Protein backbone atom coordinates (compact mmCIF):
# COMPACT_ATOMS: atom_id res chain seq x y z
CA UNK A 1 0.00 0.00 0.00
CA UNK A 2 1.62 3.27 -1.03
CA UNK A 3 1.90 6.18 1.36
CA UNK A 4 -0.43 8.47 -0.55
CA UNK A 5 -2.96 5.67 -0.67
CA UNK A 6 -2.70 5.29 3.09
CA UNK A 7 -3.61 8.91 3.48
CA UNK A 8 -6.99 8.22 1.91
CA UNK A 9 -8.06 5.55 4.34
CA UNK A 10 -9.84 6.19 7.62
CA UNK A 11 -7.47 5.56 10.52
CA UNK A 12 -9.73 3.00 12.15
CA UNK A 13 -9.66 0.92 9.02
CA UNK A 14 -5.93 1.24 8.51
CA UNK A 15 -5.42 -0.16 11.96
CA UNK A 16 -6.93 -3.43 10.81
CA UNK A 17 -4.30 -3.88 8.13
CA UNK A 18 -0.86 -5.30 8.43
CA UNK A 19 1.81 -3.86 6.21
CA UNK A 20 5.22 -5.43 6.33
CA UNK A 21 6.45 -4.88 9.84
CA UNK A 22 3.01 -4.18 11.25
CA UNK A 23 1.69 -6.51 13.90
CA UNK A 24 -0.61 -9.10 12.37
CA UNK A 25 -3.10 -8.72 15.21
CA UNK A 26 -4.19 -5.48 13.60
CA UNK A 27 -5.55 -7.44 10.67
CA UNK A 28 -7.47 -10.01 12.63
CA UNK A 29 -11.16 -9.38 12.68
CA UNK A 30 -13.22 -10.36 15.68
CA UNK A 31 -16.97 -10.57 15.80
CA UNK A 32 -17.11 -7.51 18.05
CA UNK A 33 -15.86 -4.98 15.52
CA UNK A 34 -18.46 -2.37 14.76
CA UNK A 35 -17.47 -1.39 11.27
CA UNK A 36 -17.15 -4.89 9.87
CA UNK A 37 -20.46 -6.62 9.33
CA UNK A 38 -20.62 -9.27 12.01
CA UNK A 39 -19.86 -12.67 10.60
CA UNK A 40 -22.52 -14.31 12.66
CA UNK A 41 -25.81 -16.04 12.08
CA UNK A 42 -28.74 -13.84 13.13
CA UNK A 43 -29.06 -15.98 16.23
CA UNK A 44 -26.73 -18.59 17.60
CA UNK A 45 -27.96 -22.00 16.62
CA UNK A 46 -27.82 -23.06 20.24
CA UNK A 47 -30.97 -22.56 22.29
CA UNK A 48 -30.78 -19.86 24.96
CA UNK A 49 -33.69 -21.29 26.93
CA UNK A 50 -35.75 -24.44 26.68
CA UNK A 51 -39.25 -25.28 27.82
CA UNK A 52 -40.06 -28.73 29.15
CA UNK A 53 -43.14 -29.87 27.25
CA UNK A 54 -42.52 -33.60 27.39
CA UNK A 55 -44.05 -36.06 29.79
CA UNK A 56 -41.43 -37.26 32.19
CA UNK A 57 -41.18 -41.04 32.34
CA UNK A 58 -41.10 -40.61 36.10
CA UNK A 59 -44.66 -39.25 36.06
CA UNK A 60 -46.23 -42.65 35.75
CA UNK A 61 -44.20 -44.17 38.54
CA UNK A 62 -43.91 -41.15 40.82
CA UNK A 63 -45.67 -41.35 44.19
CA UNK A 64 -48.18 -39.02 42.60
CA UNK A 65 -49.86 -41.81 40.62
CA UNK A 66 -50.81 -39.17 38.09
CA UNK A 67 -53.35 -41.36 36.31
CA UNK A 68 -55.32 -41.52 39.53
CA UNK A 69 -56.34 -37.89 39.32
CA UNK A 70 -55.43 -37.14 35.72
CA UNK A 71 -58.87 -35.89 34.82
CA UNK A 72 -58.81 -33.68 37.86
CA UNK A 73 -55.81 -31.63 36.76
CA UNK A 74 -56.39 -31.22 33.04
CA UNK A 75 -58.85 -28.36 32.69
CA UNK A 76 -58.15 -26.22 35.70
CA UNK A 77 -58.47 -22.45 35.37
CA UNK A 78 -55.84 -20.18 36.89
CA UNK A 79 -58.44 -19.28 39.56
CA UNK A 80 -58.86 -22.96 40.50
CA UNK A 81 -55.08 -23.30 40.71
CA UNK A 82 -54.74 -20.27 42.99
CA UNK A 83 -57.46 -21.67 45.23
CA UNK A 84 -55.78 -25.07 45.46
CA UNK A 85 -52.33 -23.67 46.10
CA UNK A 86 -53.56 -21.30 48.81
CA UNK A 87 -55.39 -24.10 50.62
CA UNK A 88 -53.62 -25.62 53.58
CA UNK A 89 -54.08 -29.12 52.25
CA UNK A 90 -50.91 -30.67 50.77
CA UNK A 91 -52.85 -32.98 48.43
CA UNK A 92 -54.82 -29.99 47.03
CA UNK A 93 -51.62 -27.96 46.69
CA UNK A 94 -49.99 -30.83 44.82
CA UNK A 95 -52.92 -31.22 42.44
CA UNK A 96 -53.05 -27.48 41.82
CA UNK A 97 -49.27 -27.29 41.21
CA UNK A 98 -49.52 -30.17 38.76
CA UNK A 99 -52.41 -28.44 36.99
CA UNK A 100 -50.27 -25.28 36.73
CA UNK A 101 -47.35 -27.29 35.36
CA UNK A 102 -49.61 -28.80 32.70
CA UNK A 103 -50.88 -25.38 31.63
CA UNK A 104 -47.29 -24.10 31.45
CA UNK A 105 -46.26 -27.14 29.39
CA UNK A 106 -48.83 -26.43 26.71
CA UNK A 107 -47.24 -26.28 23.26
CA UNK A 108 -49.19 -23.15 22.30
CA UNK A 109 -49.41 -19.96 24.33
CA UNK A 110 -48.78 -21.16 27.87
CA UNK A 111 -50.40 -18.64 30.27
CA UNK A 112 -47.09 -17.61 31.87
CA UNK A 113 -48.11 -14.02 32.63
CA UNK A 114 -51.42 -15.06 34.18
CA UNK A 115 -49.59 -17.41 36.53
CA UNK A 116 -47.09 -14.67 37.44
CA UNK A 117 -49.86 -12.10 37.99
CA UNK A 118 -51.68 -14.55 40.23
CA UNK A 119 -48.66 -14.34 42.55
CA UNK A 120 -47.89 -18.04 42.37
CA UNK A 121 -44.10 -17.86 41.97
CA UNK A 122 -43.26 -17.39 45.69
CA UNK A 123 -45.56 -20.34 46.45
CA UNK A 124 -43.82 -22.55 43.90
CA UNK A 125 -40.43 -21.52 45.29
CA UNK A 126 -41.54 -22.45 48.80
CA UNK A 127 -42.68 -25.86 47.51
CA UNK A 128 -39.13 -26.50 46.20
CA UNK A 129 -38.07 -26.83 49.84
CA UNK A 130 -40.67 -29.47 50.76
CA UNK A 131 -38.26 -32.39 51.11
CA UNK A 132 -41.02 -34.45 52.72
CA UNK A 133 -43.05 -34.34 49.48
CA UNK A 134 -40.86 -34.96 46.42
CA UNK A 135 -43.80 -34.87 43.94
CA UNK A 136 -44.60 -31.24 44.82
CA UNK A 137 -40.89 -30.36 44.57
CA UNK A 138 -40.82 -31.87 41.09
CA UNK A 139 -44.06 -30.26 39.87
CA UNK A 140 -43.13 -26.79 41.15
CA UNK A 141 -39.58 -27.12 39.74
CA UNK A 142 -41.03 -28.03 36.34
CA UNK A 143 -43.54 -25.15 36.47
CA UNK A 144 -40.80 -22.65 37.38
CA UNK A 145 -38.50 -24.02 34.66
CA UNK A 146 -41.14 -23.25 32.06
CA UNK A 147 -41.80 -19.77 33.43
CA UNK A 148 -38.03 -19.11 33.33
CA UNK A 149 -37.96 -20.26 29.69
CA UNK A 150 -39.96 -17.19 28.68
CA UNK A 151 -39.02 -13.55 28.22
CA UNK A 152 -36.42 -11.75 30.32
CA UNK A 153 -39.25 -10.21 32.32
CA UNK A 154 -40.69 -13.65 33.06
CA UNK A 155 -37.26 -15.06 33.99
CA UNK A 156 -36.77 -12.06 36.29
CA UNK A 157 -40.01 -12.89 38.10
CA UNK A 158 -38.61 -16.36 38.89
CA UNK A 159 -35.29 -14.90 40.09
CA UNK A 160 -37.05 -12.23 42.17
CA UNK A 161 -39.07 -14.99 43.80
CA UNK A 162 -35.85 -16.39 45.28
CA UNK A 163 -35.66 -19.42 43.01
CA UNK A 164 -31.88 -19.48 42.40
CA UNK A 165 -30.73 -20.64 45.88
CA UNK A 166 -33.72 -23.00 46.10
CA UNK A 167 -32.78 -24.66 42.80
CA UNK A 168 -29.12 -24.89 43.80
CA UNK A 169 -30.19 -26.78 46.95
CA UNK A 170 -32.23 -29.16 44.79
CA UNK A 171 -29.17 -30.12 42.70
CA UNK A 172 -28.27 -32.52 45.51
CA UNK A 173 -31.76 -34.06 45.65
CA UNK A 174 -31.68 -37.86 46.01
CA UNK A 175 -34.28 -38.00 43.21
CA UNK A 176 -32.55 -37.79 39.82
CA UNK A 177 -35.59 -36.33 38.03
CA UNK A 178 -35.81 -33.49 40.58
CA UNK A 179 -32.09 -32.79 40.41
CA UNK A 180 -32.31 -32.74 36.60
CA UNK A 181 -35.23 -30.32 36.66
CA UNK A 182 -33.17 -27.99 38.89
CA UNK A 183 -30.26 -28.22 36.41
CA UNK A 184 -32.63 -27.29 33.60
CA UNK A 185 -34.15 -24.35 35.50
CA UNK A 186 -30.70 -22.93 36.33
CA UNK A 187 -29.77 -23.29 32.65
CA UNK A 188 -32.79 -21.22 31.65
CA UNK A 189 -31.99 -18.54 34.22
CA UNK A 190 -28.28 -18.36 33.26
CA UNK A 191 -29.19 -18.32 29.55
CA UNK A 192 -31.10 -15.07 29.96
CA UNK A 193 -27.93 -12.96 29.93
CA UNK A 194 -24.77 -11.95 31.77
CA UNK A 195 -26.48 -10.53 34.85
CA UNK A 196 -28.49 -13.64 35.75
CA UNK A 197 -25.62 -15.91 34.67
CA UNK A 198 -23.36 -14.16 37.16
CA UNK A 199 -26.06 -14.33 39.83
CA UNK A 200 -26.33 -18.10 39.38
CA UNK A 201 -22.52 -18.33 39.68
CA UNK A 202 -22.49 -16.00 42.71
CA UNK A 203 -25.05 -18.17 44.51
CA UNK A 204 -22.57 -21.06 44.23
CA UNK A 205 -24.08 -23.19 41.46
CA UNK A 206 -20.81 -24.33 39.89
CA UNK A 207 -19.56 -26.68 42.64
CA UNK A 208 -22.75 -28.74 42.96
CA UNK A 209 -23.20 -28.83 39.15
CA UNK A 210 -19.66 -30.12 38.65
CA UNK A 211 -20.16 -32.59 41.51
CA UNK A 212 -22.97 -34.19 39.49
CA UNK A 213 -20.45 -34.83 36.70
CA UNK A 214 -17.69 -36.07 39.01
CA UNK A 215 -18.19 -39.73 38.14
CA UNK A 216 -15.42 -42.04 36.88
CA UNK A 217 -17.35 -42.79 33.69
CA UNK A 218 -19.73 -40.25 32.14
CA UNK A 219 -21.61 -42.96 30.29
CA UNK A 220 -23.01 -44.21 33.61
CA UNK A 221 -25.15 -41.04 33.72
CA UNK A 222 -28.55 -41.08 32.03
CA UNK A 223 -28.23 -39.57 28.56
CA UNK A 224 -30.86 -36.84 29.03
CA UNK A 225 -29.38 -35.90 32.40
CA UNK A 226 -25.88 -35.54 30.95
CA UNK A 227 -27.23 -33.48 28.04
CA UNK A 228 -29.03 -31.12 30.42
CA UNK A 229 -25.95 -30.69 32.59
CA UNK A 230 -23.77 -29.93 29.55
CA UNK A 231 -26.28 -27.43 28.18
CA UNK A 232 -26.53 -25.63 31.54
CA UNK A 233 -22.72 -25.47 31.83
CA UNK A 234 -22.59 -24.00 28.32
CA UNK A 235 -25.03 -21.27 29.37
CA UNK A 236 -22.73 -20.45 32.31
CA UNK A 237 -20.00 -19.81 29.70
CA UNK A 238 -22.28 -17.81 27.43
CA UNK A 239 -22.75 -14.06 26.89
CA UNK A 240 -20.41 -11.10 27.02
CA UNK A 241 -20.35 -7.58 28.45
CA UNK A 242 -19.18 -8.84 30.84
CA UNK A 243 -17.83 -12.27 29.98
CA UNK A 244 -18.13 -14.90 32.74
CA UNK A 245 -15.79 -14.40 35.74
CA UNK A 246 -12.30 -15.80 35.09
CA UNK A 247 -12.29 -18.02 38.17
CA UNK A 248 -15.61 -19.56 37.09
CA UNK A 249 -14.16 -20.28 33.64
CA UNK A 250 -11.05 -21.89 35.17
CA UNK A 251 -13.30 -24.03 37.35
CA UNK A 252 -15.56 -25.23 34.52
CA UNK A 253 -12.90 -25.80 31.83
CA UNK A 254 -11.51 -29.20 32.95
CA UNK A 255 -15.03 -30.66 32.96
CA UNK A 256 -15.76 -29.15 29.54
CA UNK A 257 -12.59 -30.73 28.17
CA UNK A 258 -13.83 -34.07 29.48
CA UNK A 259 -17.28 -33.58 27.93
CA UNK A 260 -15.61 -32.69 24.63
CA UNK A 261 -14.35 -36.29 24.50
CA UNK A 262 -17.75 -37.90 25.18
CA UNK A 263 -19.53 -39.74 22.38
CA UNK A 264 -23.05 -38.30 22.51
CA UNK A 265 -23.64 -35.82 19.62
CA UNK A 266 -25.72 -33.40 21.74
CA UNK A 267 -23.16 -33.37 24.54
CA UNK A 268 -20.41 -32.74 21.97
CA UNK A 269 -22.39 -29.94 20.31
CA UNK A 270 -23.09 -28.11 23.58
CA UNK A 271 -19.49 -28.57 24.78
CA UNK A 272 -18.29 -27.03 21.51
CA UNK A 273 -20.72 -24.13 21.96
CA UNK A 274 -19.32 -23.57 25.46
CA UNK A 275 -15.75 -23.49 24.10
CA UNK A 276 -16.86 -21.14 21.31
CA UNK A 277 -18.28 -18.69 23.89
CA UNK A 278 -15.12 -18.83 26.00
CA UNK A 279 -12.88 -18.12 22.99
CA UNK A 280 -15.01 -15.20 21.80
CA UNK A 281 -12.96 -12.53 23.50
CA UNK A 282 -9.47 -11.13 24.10
CA UNK A 283 -6.32 -13.21 23.62
CA UNK A 284 -6.04 -13.93 27.36
CA UNK A 285 -9.45 -15.67 27.28
CA UNK A 286 -8.41 -17.62 24.19
CA UNK A 287 -5.19 -18.64 25.96
CA UNK A 288 -7.10 -20.07 28.94
CA UNK A 289 -8.82 -22.48 26.56
CA UNK A 290 -5.86 -23.23 24.28
CA UNK A 291 -3.54 -24.13 27.14
CA UNK A 292 -5.99 -26.82 28.26
CA UNK A 293 -5.01 -28.67 25.06
CA UNK A 294 -8.48 -28.72 23.46
CA UNK A 295 -7.44 -27.64 19.96
CA UNK A 296 -6.71 -31.16 18.57
CA UNK A 297 -10.11 -32.41 19.76
CA UNK A 298 -11.87 -29.35 18.28
CA UNK A 299 -10.13 -30.04 14.96
CA UNK A 300 -11.26 -33.66 15.13
CA UNK A 301 -14.86 -32.50 15.70
CA UNK A 302 -14.49 -30.06 12.80
CA UNK A 303 -14.43 -33.14 10.60
CA UNK A 304 -17.61 -34.61 12.14
CA UNK A 305 -20.54 -35.51 9.90
CA UNK A 306 -23.16 -33.89 12.16
CA UNK A 307 -23.79 -30.23 11.33
CA UNK A 308 -24.80 -29.40 14.95
CA UNK A 309 -21.25 -30.38 16.00
CA UNK A 310 -19.37 -28.84 13.06
CA UNK A 311 -21.07 -25.44 13.47
CA UNK A 312 -19.83 -24.68 17.02
CA UNK A 313 -16.48 -26.47 16.49
CA UNK A 314 -15.83 -24.18 13.51
CA UNK A 315 -16.96 -21.15 15.51
CA UNK A 316 -14.49 -22.06 18.28
CA UNK A 317 -11.60 -22.62 15.84
CA UNK A 318 -12.53 -19.36 14.08
CA UNK A 319 -12.41 -17.51 17.39
CA UNK A 320 -9.03 -19.01 18.33
CA UNK A 321 -7.39 -17.77 15.11
CA UNK A 322 -8.47 -14.20 15.92
CA UNK A 323 -5.80 -14.48 18.63
CA UNK A 324 -2.03 -14.36 18.40
CA UNK A 325 0.13 -15.97 15.71
CA UNK A 326 1.10 -18.60 18.31
CA UNK A 327 -2.55 -19.44 19.05
CA UNK A 328 -3.23 -19.66 15.31
CA UNK A 329 -0.22 -21.96 14.94
CA UNK A 330 -1.78 -24.39 17.46
CA UNK A 331 -4.76 -24.68 15.10
CA UNK A 332 -2.50 -25.25 12.07
CA UNK A 333 -0.35 -27.78 13.97
CA UNK A 334 -3.47 -29.75 14.92
CA UNK A 335 -4.13 -30.31 11.21
CA UNK A 336 -7.13 -27.99 10.83
CA UNK A 337 -6.19 -26.86 7.32
CA UNK A 338 -6.77 -30.37 5.96
CA UNK A 339 -10.48 -30.05 6.84
CA UNK A 340 -10.96 -26.73 5.03
CA UNK A 341 -11.46 -28.02 1.46
CA UNK A 342 -14.71 -29.63 2.62
CA UNK A 343 -15.69 -26.65 4.82
CA UNK A 344 -15.10 -24.12 2.03
CA UNK A 345 -17.35 -26.14 -0.30
CA UNK A 346 -19.94 -27.09 2.33
CA UNK A 347 -23.52 -26.92 0.98
CA UNK A 348 -24.53 -24.96 4.11
CA UNK A 349 -23.92 -21.28 3.37
CA UNK A 350 -23.24 -20.47 7.00
CA UNK A 351 -20.48 -23.08 7.28
CA UNK A 352 -18.84 -21.76 4.09
CA UNK A 353 -19.02 -18.21 5.42
CA UNK A 354 -17.55 -19.06 8.84
CA UNK A 355 -14.83 -21.18 7.23
CA UNK A 356 -13.88 -18.29 4.93
CA UNK A 357 -13.90 -15.86 7.87
CA UNK A 358 -11.56 -18.27 9.68
CA UNK A 359 -9.28 -18.39 6.63
CA UNK A 360 -9.18 -14.58 6.56
CA UNK A 361 -7.71 -14.60 10.05
CA UNK A 362 -5.17 -17.30 9.18
CA UNK A 363 -4.00 -15.35 6.09
CA UNK A 364 -3.56 -12.37 8.43
CA UNK A 365 -0.76 -14.35 10.08
CA UNK A 366 2.91 -14.88 9.39
CA UNK A 367 4.36 -15.70 5.98
CA UNK A 368 5.05 -19.29 7.04
CA UNK A 369 1.37 -19.57 8.00
CA UNK A 370 0.31 -18.21 4.60
CA UNK A 371 2.66 -20.82 3.11
CA UNK A 372 0.77 -23.55 5.01
CA UNK A 373 -2.44 -22.30 3.38
CA UNK A 374 -0.67 -22.59 0.01
CA UNK A 375 0.75 -26.05 0.80
CA UNK A 376 -2.67 -27.38 1.77
CA UNK A 377 -4.00 -26.36 -1.64
CA UNK A 378 -6.48 -23.88 -0.16
CA UNK A 379 -5.82 -20.93 -2.48
CA UNK A 380 -7.86 -22.43 -5.38
CA UNK A 381 -10.71 -22.98 -2.90
CA UNK A 382 -10.57 -19.31 -1.84
CA UNK A 383 -10.60 -18.32 -5.53
CA UNK A 384 -13.66 -20.57 -5.94
CA UNK A 385 -15.46 -18.95 -3.02
CA UNK A 386 -14.61 -15.48 -4.33
CA UNK A 387 -15.99 -16.50 -7.75
CA UNK A 388 -19.29 -18.09 -6.91
CA UNK A 389 -20.27 -18.16 -3.24
CA UNK A 390 -23.07 -16.29 -1.52
CA UNK A 391 -22.22 -12.54 -1.30
CA UNK A 392 -21.55 -12.53 2.47
CA UNK A 393 -19.09 -15.39 1.97
CA UNK A 394 -17.48 -13.58 -0.98
CA UNK A 395 -16.91 -10.61 1.33
CA UNK A 396 -15.04 -12.86 3.75
CA UNK A 397 -13.00 -14.22 0.84
CA UNK A 398 -12.09 -10.66 -0.18
CA UNK A 399 -10.74 -10.08 3.33
CA UNK A 400 -8.83 -13.37 3.18
CA UNK A 401 -7.21 -12.36 -0.12
CA UNK A 402 -6.37 -8.82 1.00
CA UNK A 403 -4.78 -10.12 4.19
CA UNK A 404 -2.83 -12.66 2.13
CA UNK A 405 -1.55 -9.94 -0.23
CA UNK A 406 -0.68 -7.63 2.67
CA UNK A 407 1.47 -10.13 4.50
CA UNK A 408 2.54 -12.58 1.79
CA UNK A 409 5.86 -12.79 -0.03
CA UNK A 410 6.19 -11.83 -3.69
CA UNK A 411 6.26 -15.55 -4.56
CA UNK A 412 3.08 -16.18 -2.60
CA UNK A 413 1.33 -13.29 -4.35
CA UNK A 414 2.50 -14.53 -7.77
CA UNK A 415 1.05 -17.95 -6.90
CA UNK A 416 -2.25 -16.29 -5.98
CA UNK A 417 -2.41 -14.59 -9.38
CA UNK A 418 -1.51 -17.89 -11.03
CA UNK A 419 -4.53 -19.48 -9.30
CA UNK A 420 -6.81 -17.02 -11.12
CA UNK A 421 -7.59 -14.45 -8.44
CA UNK A 422 -7.67 -11.38 -10.71
CA UNK A 423 -10.95 -11.95 -12.53
CA UNK A 424 -13.18 -12.80 -9.51
CA UNK A 425 -11.55 -9.94 -7.59
CA UNK A 426 -12.43 -7.51 -10.41
CA UNK A 427 -15.98 -8.86 -10.69
CA UNK A 428 -16.64 -8.01 -7.04
CA UNK A 429 -15.79 -4.36 -7.69
CA UNK A 430 -19.36 -4.04 -9.03
CA UNK A 431 -20.73 -4.75 -5.54
CA UNK A 432 -22.76 -2.07 -3.82
CA UNK A 433 -20.75 -2.54 -0.63
CA UNK A 434 -18.27 0.29 -0.06
CA UNK A 435 -16.28 -1.53 2.60
CA UNK A 436 -15.63 -4.53 0.36
CA UNK A 437 -14.66 -2.29 -2.57
CA UNK A 438 -12.04 -0.67 -0.32
CA UNK A 439 -10.76 -4.08 0.72
CA UNK A 440 -10.45 -5.22 -2.92
CA UNK A 441 -8.71 -2.02 -4.02
CA UNK A 442 -6.17 -2.66 -1.27
CA UNK A 443 -5.61 -6.18 -2.57
CA UNK A 444 -5.10 -4.87 -6.12
CA UNK A 445 -2.64 -2.30 -4.84
CA UNK A 446 -0.74 -5.00 -2.92
CA UNK A 447 -0.58 -7.24 -6.00
CA UNK A 448 0.74 -4.32 -8.07
CA UNK A 449 3.46 -3.74 -5.48
CA UNK A 450 4.57 -7.35 -5.90
CA UNK A 451 4.50 -6.89 -9.70
CA UNK A 452 6.63 -3.74 -9.30
CA UNK A 453 9.30 -5.75 -7.51
CA UNK A 454 9.38 -8.06 -10.53
CA UNK A 455 9.15 -5.25 -13.09
CA UNK A 456 5.87 -6.79 -14.25
CA UNK A 457 3.29 -4.04 -13.67
CA UNK A 458 2.51 -3.70 -17.40
CA UNK A 459 1.59 -7.35 -17.71
CA UNK A 460 -0.59 -7.18 -14.62
CA UNK A 461 -2.32 -4.10 -16.08
CA UNK A 462 -3.06 -6.05 -19.28
CA UNK A 463 -4.52 -8.95 -17.30
CA UNK A 464 -6.76 -6.57 -15.37
CA UNK A 465 -7.83 -4.82 -18.55
CA UNK A 466 -8.57 -8.07 -20.37
CA UNK A 467 -11.05 -9.26 -17.75
CA UNK A 468 -12.89 -5.93 -17.68
CA UNK A 469 -11.26 -4.78 -14.46
CA UNK A 470 -9.98 -1.48 -15.80
CA UNK A 471 -13.50 -0.31 -16.69
CA UNK A 472 -14.63 -1.12 -13.17
CA UNK A 473 -11.71 0.70 -11.55
CA UNK A 474 -12.33 3.71 -13.81
CA UNK A 475 -16.01 3.77 -12.86
CA UNK A 476 -15.02 3.87 -9.17
CA UNK A 477 -13.35 7.25 -9.73
CA UNK A 478 -16.90 8.61 -9.61
CA UNK A 479 -17.76 6.76 -6.39
CA UNK A 480 -19.38 8.80 -3.61
CA UNK A 481 -16.94 7.47 -1.01
CA UNK A 482 -13.78 9.55 -0.84
CA UNK A 483 -11.37 6.75 0.00
CA UNK A 484 -12.79 4.59 -2.83
CA UNK A 485 -12.44 7.22 -5.53
CA UNK A 486 -9.00 8.28 -4.32
CA UNK A 487 -7.73 4.68 -4.21
CA UNK A 488 -9.09 3.95 -7.70
CA UNK A 489 -7.68 7.21 -9.05
CA UNK A 490 -4.34 6.32 -7.53
CA UNK A 491 -4.33 2.91 -9.27
CA UNK A 492 -5.29 4.46 -12.63
CA UNK A 493 -2.64 7.19 -12.41
CA UNK A 494 0.05 4.83 -11.25
CA UNK A 495 -0.49 1.78 -13.43
CA UNK A 496 -2.91 2.56 -16.26
CA UNK A 497 -2.07 6.11 -17.21
CA UNK A 498 -1.51 6.81 -20.93
CA UNK A 499 0.92 9.58 -20.05
CA UNK A 500 3.18 6.95 -18.52
CA UNK A 501 6.16 6.08 -20.68
CA UNK A 502 5.11 2.97 -22.47
CA UNK A 503 7.20 0.40 -24.17
CA UNK A 504 4.83 -0.75 -26.89
CA UNK A 505 6.84 -3.93 -27.29
CA UNK A 506 6.07 -5.22 -23.82
CA UNK A 507 3.49 -7.92 -24.20
CA UNK A 508 3.25 -10.81 -21.81
CA UNK A 509 4.48 -14.04 -23.28
CA UNK A 510 1.50 -16.39 -23.43
CA UNK A 511 2.01 -19.87 -22.06
CA UNK A 512 -0.49 -22.69 -21.73
CA UNK A 513 -1.03 -21.58 -18.15
CA UNK A 514 -1.49 -17.88 -18.78
CA UNK A 515 0.93 -14.97 -18.75
CA UNK A 516 4.53 -15.70 -17.86
CA UNK A 517 6.09 -12.96 -15.78
CA UNK A 518 9.87 -12.80 -15.82
CA UNK A 519 11.62 -11.99 -12.56
CA UNK A 520 13.44 -8.72 -13.11
CA UNK A 521 16.61 -9.53 -11.23
CA UNK A 522 17.26 -12.53 -13.40
CA UNK A 523 16.44 -15.05 -10.71
CA UNK A 524 16.03 -18.50 -12.20
CA UNK A 525 12.55 -19.63 -13.18
CA UNK A 526 9.41 -17.94 -14.41
CA UNK A 527 6.50 -16.84 -12.30
CA UNK A 528 3.32 -17.77 -14.12
CA UNK A 529 0.70 -15.14 -13.53
From Swiss-Prot:
Keywords linked to the UniProt accession: Acetylation, Cytoplasm, Nucleus, Phosphoprotein, Protein transport, Repeat, Transport, Ubl conjugation
Region (NLS binding site (minor)): 315-403
An MF annotation (GO) of this entry: DNA-binding transcription factor binding
Gene Ontology CC terms: cytoplasmic stress granule; cytosol; glutamatergic synapse; host cell; NLS-dependent protein nuclear import complex; nucleoplasm; postsynaptic density
Segments carrying motif Nuclear localization signal: 45-54
UniProt superkingdom: Eukaryota
Post-translational modification: Ubiquitinated. Deubiquitinated by USP22; leading to stabilization and increased activity.
Chain residue ranges for the region called NLS binding site (major): 142-238
Alphabetized Gene3D superfamilies for the sequence: Importin-alpha, importin-beta-binding domain, Leucine-rich Repeat Variant
Reported tissue expression: Slightly detected in brain but not in cerebellum and skeletal muscle, highly expressed in testis and spleen.
Residue numbers of Phosphoserine PTMs: 62
Modification type N-acetylserine: residues: 2
Location of this chain's protein in the cell: Cytoplasm; Nucleus
PROSITE patterns cross-referenced by the UniProt entry: ARM_REPEAT, IBB
Residue segments, region Disordered: 45-70
GO biological process, one term: entry of viral genome into host nucleus through nuclear pore complex via importin
UniProt keyword Endoplasmic reticulum present: no
ARM repeat spans: 71-111, 112-151, 152-193, 200-244, 246-282, 283-322, 325-364, 367-409, 410-456, 457-496
Domain IBB: 2-60
Subunit structure: Heterodimer; with KPNB1. Component of a complex containing CSE1L, RAN and KPNA2. Interacts directly with CSE1L. Interacts with PLAG1. Interacts with APEX1 (via N-terminus). Interacts with FRG1 (via N-terminus). Interacts with ARL4A, CTNNBL1 and NBN. Interacts with ANP32E. Interacts with SNAI1 (via zinc fingers). Interacts with SNAI2 (via zinc fingers). Interacts with BAG6. Interacts with AIFM2; this interaction likely mediates the translocation of AIFM2 into the nucleus upon oxidative stress. Interacts with RSL1D1.
Family the UniProt entry places it in: Belongs to the importin alpha family.
Record text about domains: Consists of an N-terminal hydrophilic region, a hydrophobic central region composed of 10 repeats, and a short hydrophilic C-terminus. The N-terminal hydrophilic region contains the importin beta binding domain (IBB domain), which is sufficient for binding importin beta and essential for nuclear protein import. The IBB domain is thought to act as an intrasteric autoregulatory sequence by interacting with the internal autoinhibitory NLS. Binding of KPNB1 probably overlaps the internal NLS and contributes to a high affinity for cytoplasmic NLS-containing cargo substrates. After dissociation of the importin/substrate complex in the nucleus the internal autohibitory NLS contributes to a low affinity for nuclear NLS-containing proteins.
Main function: Functions in nuclear protein import as an adapter protein for nuclear receptor KPNB1. Binds specifically and directly to substrates containing either a simple or bipartite NLS motif. Docking of the importin/substrate complex to the nuclear pore complex (NPC) is mediated by KPNB1 through binding to nucleoporin FxFG repeats and the complex is subsequently translocated through the pore by an energy requiring, Ran-dependent mechanism.
Protein name, per record: Importin subunit alpha-1
Organism listed in the record: Mus musculus (Mouse)
Gene for this chain: Kpna2
